[in-house]
Amino acid sequence: MGAEYGCLPSTSQALYVILLIVLVRMSLVFVQFPKYLRCYRCLLETKELGCLLGSDICLAPPGSSCMTLLIKNSSSGSDIMVSDCRHKEQMSDCSYTRSSPVFGFWIFSRCCLREFCNNPQNRVFYIP
């Protein structure tokens, strides 16, 4: 009689096999999701007061970047910053310096490709 049961797996072995199959399938599902870049988002920020409207996190899809705009008033020296995600279709204007339509203001744009690279502790501006 013992030989008859030697070929059949025990209940615990069957459960382990099922659990292993489920875990392998779950890991394959998670591998298929693209990795999003996490960026700092603040729509109105000054160096003196920080983020005025509250900050949060945005997710940039693969091939996209984090971005910070610096709007500089050349006469008063006050700076306003906007930080957000930049989709790959919009990355043509990632690094530029141009005058604003408003006299005396300049706009500097900078993109970066690391996690939270545009948050206040990590960002560096190269301003002429």
From Swiss-Prot:
The keyword Disulfide bond applies. It holds the Pfam family UPAR_LY6. It is found in: Secreted. Residues 1-29 form the signal peptide. Disulfide bonds join 39-66, 42-51, 58-85, 94-111, 112-117. Glycans are attached at residue 73. Abundantly expressed in the epididymis. Keywords: Disulfide bond, Glycoprotein, Secreted, Signal. May have a role in hematopoietic cell differentiation. This is Lymphocyte antigen 6 complex locus protein G5c. It comes from Canis lupus familiaris. The gene is LY6G5C.
